[in-house]
Amino acid sequence: LVPVANSSNLLAGRVPGVMTRQNSGLPGGENTQIRIRSFSEAPLVLVDGVQMDFSRIDQNDIESISVLKDASAAVYGARAGNGVVLVTTKRGQSGKPKISYSSNLTLQSATAFLDHVSASQYVELVREANLNDFNDANATFTELDVENYSNKIQGYEGGNWVDALIKNNAPMHQHNLSVSGGNENVKYFTSFGYVDQESFFNSRDFDYRRYNTRSNIDIKINERINFFVDLSYRQDIRERPSKTALSNIWIDLSTAQPIYPTTLSNNIKVPDPSVSSVSYSGSTTGNRNPIARSDRSIFGTYDRLDNTFRGKIGFKYKVPGVDGLTLGTDIN
């Protein structure tokens, strides 16, 4: 499997007629949408027969994934009008205990990013716009300014806001340890998972961590009755700057002017996150410093901790005299 933080992304490009769309690249906030055959609504997702969010499952716990469309999904009723995704988690098998460990280090990179002009290019373009809109007397920058920025004279170095804000790659660590086994009467599967996903920002202040564990136990009471217990726990930790929407950072970056340095002379990041940008015509844009927005030490902190526990117990009864007929019930 391709290492992913969100299991919903496993379906991308793998199943005919199934489309996925990741609405955000923010660690822990991918919010991937699944659509089957262009339906406008999400399909019904059943994990071991229980309706739940596909993204809440560790990919290492998945045994199989099936996608049902049209008539094949009709058995699940009105809820299956947009298709069905069936996910089965791993279970124990008879035999000696089997211990498995997997570890992945993934470097995520941006597929495309717009190039920004340099300080000297920006000054030349603003001066050209001024001369076209007004006249030479009202030009924001003089010819001397253009020369100074081109030669990077002290005080005219400018700054590369893209490089100061964003790194070329973001690492993601994944670890999973599982133990399975059993005998004729009792079978078990237990797993422990950990994910640490960093963001593209130099501040590394949009981190996401996840701890998860799962235990599936099957007990054979007699030749006709089987009892099972499925337990899972997951903890999601999201650490972000306070009240920062990702879209705001990109908007601020698009208006950040390269004539201004990204740090002060003592190499301290620009301390005031509320300073407005000034357009070439002299009006303020009202946007903030994108680097400050991405830094918890400047913009404050917003931490979110989610704990999710799920449990399912039930039994299956083989009806005597009718081959293959099984009755069952479960509580979750």
Model-derived regions: residue spans:
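Outer-membrane beta-barrel transmembrane strands
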Residues: K167-E184, G193, S232, N287-N332
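Outer-membrane beta-barrel proteins, especially TonB-dependent receptors
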Residues: N138, E143-D145, K152, R209-N212, ...
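Short loop/turn motifs enriched for small/polar and acidic residues
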Residues: R37, N104, S232-D236, D330-N332
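Composition- and surface-driven signal marking solvent-exposed, interaction-prone regions
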Residues: D115, S203-F206, D230-L231, K243-T244, ...
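Short, small/polar-rich motifs associated with maturation and membrane association
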Residues: L1-R214, N226-F228, T284-T285
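A surface-exposed, glycine/aromatic-enriched loop/edge motif typical of exported proteins
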Residues: S109-E143, R234-S283, N332
